[in-house]
Amino acid sequence: MSQDWKEYAKRVLDEWQPRTKLGMLVKEGQITDIHEIFRRGYQIKEPEIIDVLLPEVNARENQEIIDIALTVRMTDSGRRVRFRVLAAVGNRDGYVGLGIGHGREVGIAIRKAINYAKLNIIEIKRGCGSWECRCRRPHSVPFAVEGKEGSVRVRLIPGPRGLGLVIGDVGKKILRLAGIQDVWSQTFGETRTTVNFAKAVFNALYNTNRVVVTPEMIERYGIVVGRAMPTSFTLE
């Protein structure tokens, strides 16, 4: 974590008044690593938790506006126009979040979507599960995983180093934010539905956590959970 982001995290800590137990633990310095949150099974309900433990997701290059749509709703007083924004955030090293925000103005909807993406951040497993590579570096998924949303189904398959991301543009944005550099993919269903496709990719990444790995698999595929180079923020 760069010095600039450490200073940003300290400013957030100084101004933040936590409203949840987890927030208090972070504020008091009892939790200094985001991996600890997932290990203990806490639910993130305050975006400031991410601003402190994963401040680099606030960098412009670590945020993606995936889709902006205009929604019209008929009410007794006439038509009500609102914006719906789908956004993703990530540290490009094992953590990624996806969120949807609504608002009468596009700027408000974007800010809401980014905040919801922070609340929905997940920790993923990475590694080298490709039989063509076996470099044991965390550049791909360690094994094939599948995600589903609505009629859309996405399967991510380990790829060798240098392959790149063989998936649609929406999938590329989410995978890059998660720190995945090489992957094959198979897609099924109405993949032109941007929101469902994005959620299916996100769900596939989440499902890397559903596979129980053995010490032998960790050694063989170079499996890493979360950051490849763990760092933590402290008040000191």
Curated annotation (Swiss-Prot):
Keywords of the record? Ribonucleoprotein, Ribosomal protein, RNA-binding, rRNA-binding
Does Ribosomal protein appear among the keywords? yes
Q: Which GO terms describe its cellular component?
A: cytosolic small ribosomal subunit
Question: Looking at the record's lineage, which domain of life comes first?
Answer: Archaea
Under the heading InterPro entries, the entry gives:
Ribosomal_Su5_D2-typ_SF (IPR020568), Ribosomal_uS5 (IPR000851), Ribosomal_uS5_arc (IPR047866), Ribosomal_uS5_C (IPR005324), Ribosomal_uS5_euk/arc (IPR005711), Ribosomal_uS5_N (IPR013810), Ribosomal_uS5_N_CS (IPR018192), Ribsml_uS5_D2-typ_fold_subgr (IPR014721)
Q: Which GO terms describe its biological process?
A: translation
- Spell out the PROSITE patterns in the cross-references: RIBOSOMAL_S5, S5_DSRBD
Q: Which GO terms describe its molecular function?
A: rRNA binding; structural constituent of ribosome
What region holds the S5 DRBM domain? 61-124
The record, for NCBIfam families, names: PRK04044.1, uS5_euk_arch
Assigned protein family? Belongs to the universal ribosomal protein uS5 family.
Q: How does it assemble?
A: Part of the 30S ribosomal subunit. Contacts protein S4.
Q: Please state what the annotation says regarding this protein's domains.
A: The N-terminal domain interacts with the head of the 30S subunit; the C-terminal domain interacts with the body and contacts protein S4. The interaction surface between S4 and S5 is involved in control of translational fidelity.
Function of this protein?
With S4 and S12 plays an important role in translational accuracy.
Q: This chain belongs to which protein, by name?
A: Small ribosomal subunit protein uS5
Record the organism. Answer: Pyrococcus horikoshii (strain ATCC 700860 / DSM 12428 / JCM 9974 / NBRC 100139 / OT-3)
